Amino acid sequence: MGPEEAIVHQDESMRIHRLLHHLDEPYREVFTLRTLGQLSFRDIGELFGKSENWACVVYHRARAKIKDKMEEWS
């Protein structure tokens, strides 16, 4: 990755980080556990006392919310 790409990547990371602070729970926690913690949906579901499917749905909703906000803020 060249210097320009690294800067773009860093800017994107900062935008996502700011957006995470605007997400409600459990979206923020599930998204963070999945992306940064690299936990499986099964493990995330167990942490919350929910199903694997619940964790998957919440994660994908969180991603959609982040994507929508990124488009709004662009």
What name fits each language-model region?
Residues 37-38:
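Flexible coil/turn residues that form the inter-helical turn or adjacent wing/linker of helix-turn-helix
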Residues 30-34:
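A short pre-motif secondary-structure segment
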Residues 1-21:
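Acidic, proline/glycine-rich intrinsically disordered inter-domain spacer in sigma factors
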Residues 42, 46-73:
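DNA-recognition helix of helix-turn-helix
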Residues 26-27:
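The N-cap/first-turn positions of alpha helices
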